[in-house]
């Protein structure tokens, strides 16, 4: 991991440069969770939003857009965030024939870098959705049962009796494994099964406070821990992280084919 560009000083490219993109194999994290790429217990997406996206049209006139980048959870690799930022900035002084040409090129480059399916959507600023509150119950006012700051699945508790509900917390904090910078997020859990006590889920969320890992890996650990400890019939986990360098990362994992929630929260 020491070879990646995150945390290093580098010059921003002045022209289109797909070589900026730096993949990190998903297997590096998944092996520690006992996950096999050929038999994943979930499907999902990593949804990145790019807020600082610009290029030139053929006349040299700047274009600006909001970019939505959806990486299938089955891709071989995630893309290191700083390299993604450098890649997007390489479009700033490059001329393109159309928005469609930019979108197609980005989709090809990101698919090549990640080794799998990627969907890219560019939208004008006027099309951006308003802020929303996640569906379900916020658990942040529950008392904290244990002040533990490293992930501990044993904190999760269930009560007998099947329910179908959605719980969320704004208190998720993890940390970049390269720079140590804090990563802040709202995490949303939708499930059907024995009732997860809100207090125990809150304690579990808080236990990530000193944990170092990438966003995507944190969500997969949350998913696998809840499955192992609580055994829900259906489970979806979604984290909306705050943006850094004009990009936010929003991993979603589900075992029931649930639709990706479309909301954007207040810290984004």
Swiss-Prot record:
Recorded metabolic or biological pathway in which this protein acts: tRNA modification; tRNA-queuosine biosynthesis
Subcellular location: Cytoplasm
Statement: the UniProt record of this protein carries the keyword Manganese: no
Top EC category: oxidoreductase
Entry keyword set: Cytoplasm, NADP, Oxidoreductase, Queuosine biosynthesis
Lineage top rank: taxon: Bacteria
Residues engaged in binding NADPH: 81-82, 244-245
Gene Ontology, cellular component aspect: cytoplasm
Biological process, per Gene Ontology: queuosine biosynthetic process; tRNA modification
Binding site for substrate: 79-81, 215-216
Reactions it catalyzes: 7-aminomethyl-7-carbaguanine + 2 NADP(+) = 7-cyano-7-deazaguanine + 2 NADPH + 3 H(+)
Active site, per annotation: 176 (thioimide intermediate), 183 (proton donor)
Documented EC number(s): 1.7.1.13
GO MF annotation list: preQ1 synthase activity
Subunit structure, interactors included: Homodimer.
Family label: Belongs to the GTP cyclohydrolase I family. QueF type 2 subfamily.
Purpose: Catalyzes the NADPH-dependent reduction of 7-cyano-7-deazaguanine (preQ0) to 7-aminomethyl-7-deazaguanine (preQ1).
Name the UniProt record assigns to this protein: NADPH-dependent 7-cyano-7-deazaguanine reductase
Annotated source species: Saccharophagus degradans (strain 2-40 / ATCC 43961 / DSM 17024)
Gene (UniProt): queF
């Amino acid at each position: 991991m020491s070879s990646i560009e995150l945390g290093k000083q580098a010059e921003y490219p002045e022209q289109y440069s797909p070589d900026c993109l730096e993949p990190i194999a998903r297997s590096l994290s998944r092996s520690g969770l006992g996950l096999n790429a050929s038999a994943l217990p979930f499907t999902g997406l990593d949804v990145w939003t790019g807020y600082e996206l610009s290029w030139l049209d053929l006349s040299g006139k700047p274009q600006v857009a909001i970019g939505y980048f959806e990486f299938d959870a089955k891709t071989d690799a995630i893309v290191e965030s700083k390299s993604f930022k450098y890649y997007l900035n390489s479009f700033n002084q490059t001329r393109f024939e159309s928005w469609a040409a930019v979108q197609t090129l980005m989709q090809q480059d990101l698919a090549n870098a990640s080794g799998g399916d990627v969907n890219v959507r560019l939208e004008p600023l006027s099309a951006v959705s308003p802020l929303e509150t996640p569906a379900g119950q916020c658990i942040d006012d529950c008392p904290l049962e244990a002040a533990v700051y490293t992930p501990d699945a044993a904190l999760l508790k269930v009560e007998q009796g099947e329910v179908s509900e959605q719980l969320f917390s704004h208190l998720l904090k993890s940390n970049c494994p390269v720079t140590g910078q804090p990563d802040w997020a709202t995490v949303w859990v939708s499930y059907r099964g024995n009732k997860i006590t809100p207090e125990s889920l809150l304690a579990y969320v808080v236990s990530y406070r000193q944990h170092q890992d990438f966003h995507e890996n944190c969500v997969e650990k949350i998913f696998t821990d809840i499955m192992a400890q609580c055994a829900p019939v259906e489970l979806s986990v979604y984290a909306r992280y705050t943006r850094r360098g004009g990009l936010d990362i929003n991993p979603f994992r589900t075992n029931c084919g649930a639709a990706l929630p479309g909301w954007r929260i207040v810290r984004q």
